[in-house]
Curated annotation (Swiss-Prot):
The gene is cbiD. It comes from Methanocaldococcus jannaschii (strain ATCC 43067 / DSM 2661 / JAL-1 / JCM 10045 / NBRC 100440) (Methanococcus jannaschii). PANTHER family: COBALT-PRECORRIN-5B C(1)-METHYLTRANSFERASE. Pathway: Cofactor biosynthesis; adenosylcobalamin biosynthesis; cob(II)yrinate a,c-diamide from sirohydrochlorin (anaerobic route): step 6/10. This is Cobalt-precorrin-5B C(1)-methyltransferase. Its EC number is 2.1.1.195. It catalyses: Co-precorrin-5B + S-adenosyl-L-methionine = Co-precorrin-6A + S-adenosyl-L-homocysteine. Keywords: Cobalamin biosynthesis, Methyltransferase, S-adenosyl-L-methionine, Transferase. GO terms for molecular function: cobalt-precorrin-5B C1-methyltransferase activity. GO terms for biological process: anaerobic cobalamin biosynthetic process; methylation. Belongs to the CbiD family.
């Protein structure tokens, strides 16, 4: 298939594709003296990607190209940033050497696809860069490629890279080189390595949290370490599939009620655009403990989960309801992800425990 990114598309291209396209255009200029306004590269599936080149310049015996990252319809933090590739041609046995420059992170923890101490350029992008550049090389030529991201160090602070032990910049990512619209593919794939890091550091029980609130209180209440806390965002189904695939045996579901209650309803992508039903779920479970139609109606029409918590407190059934919800979360997840031992703790915005359940079934 051909993806032509010279025109606006719902598809986008990854940082790995940017690096491959930039390296190809810079090497082409170095060898043949022609500046290309776009290049056609091939991904590992055999698809053709036509990617525009923003700028090319020569610096002595080196050439440098700039490619602007375009995320298409799946906008992420890297959309619109510059990916710069500098190439230098040397004599030697035909080869492609890939290095990380300014703004590309360095891996400092075990468990990731890239070895500790290496620049965070994943294997698939490396392979794509290598395959495309080898087409331009003679048998006695070696090309050295250095990838830089000018805003990488600053932007990396807003990603999971610091938690994963990738310091000083962003990662060069991409499996197919293509960003698919509204797939959240890049973001989801940035979440999954947390599991690898945790397992590599010997953690047997992982703590799955929706985000910052869960992380904060898991540290305070459970004395948990960063590496055993796995932030899943809204992608519970995806992350639990990954945990199962990687052989995780025990998971504690921990976090604010607003997200966790959706799991009790069998909702495994908890983004409000996908599904909500918080009030409906709360009303259904509360009705098991409250014989008051007006109170149930108030729950159904509440604006926030915190409002529901107040109603349940007034009725004296707060812990009963949330203990039961925690139990249903454990039962639901255990039915679908067999072989993993689940527990669940639900908290409010202050980190106070509303309900919990530990299922000891083997």
């Amino acid at each position: 298939m051909i993806y032509d990114f010279r025109k606006k598309s719902k598809f986008g291209y990854t940082t790995g594709s940017c690096a491959a396209a930039g390296a190809y255009s810079a090497l082409y200029y170095l060898k043949f003296g022609k500046k290309l306004s776009y290049v056609e590269i091939e991904n590992l599936n055999g698809d053709k990607l036509i990617i525009p080149i923003e700028k090319i310049e020569k610096c002595g015996n080196k050439a440098k190209a700039v490619v602007i990252k375009d995320a298409g319809g799946d906008i992420d933090i890297t959309n619109g940033i510059e990916i710069i590739t500098e190439v230098e041609l040397k004599k030697g046995k035909k080869d492609v050497i890939i290095k990380g420059g300014e703004g590309v992170g360095i891996v400092t923890k075990n468990g990731l696809q890239v070895k500790k101490g290496e620049p965070a350029i994943n294997p698939k992008p490396r392979e794509m860069i290598r395959n495309n550049l080898l087409k331009l090389l003679n048998d006695d030529e070696v090309v050295e490629v250095t990838i830089s991201i000018p805003k990488g160090k600053e932007l990396a602070k807003k990603t999971l890279n610091p938690k994963l032990g990738i310091v000083g910049g962003l990662s060069i990512l991409g499996t197919t080189g293509i960003v698919r619209p509204m797939s959240n593919e890049a973001y989801m794939n940035s979440l999954a390595p947390q599991i690898d890091v945790a397992l590599a550091n010997g953690y047997k029980r992982l703590i799955f949290v929706p985000g910052n609130i869960g992380t904060k209180y898991a540290k305070q209440l459970l004395n948990a370490n960063d590496d055993e806390i796995i932030e899943v965002s809204n992608f519970w189904g995806f992350m639990l599939d990954k945990a199962k695939e990687k052989g995780v045996e025990e998971i504690l579901i921990f976090g604010h009620a607003g997200k966790i209650i959706k799991l009790a309803g069998g909702i495994y992508n908890t983004h409000s655009k996908v599904a909500d039903c918080r009030n409906e779920i709360l009303a259904a479970y509360s009705s098991l403990f409250i014989d008051d139609k007006e109170a149930i109606k108030k729950i159904l029409y509440s604006n926030t989960t915190e409002e529901v918590i107040k109603i349940l407190e007034e009725k004296g059934v707060l812990n009963d309801v949330f203990n039961f919800i925690a139990k249903r979360v454990v039962e639901r997840l255990s039915e679908r992800w067999k072989g993993i031992k689940f527990s669940c703790i639900i908290i409010n915005m202050k980190g106070e425990v509303l309900g919990s359940y530990i299922w000891n079934k083997k």
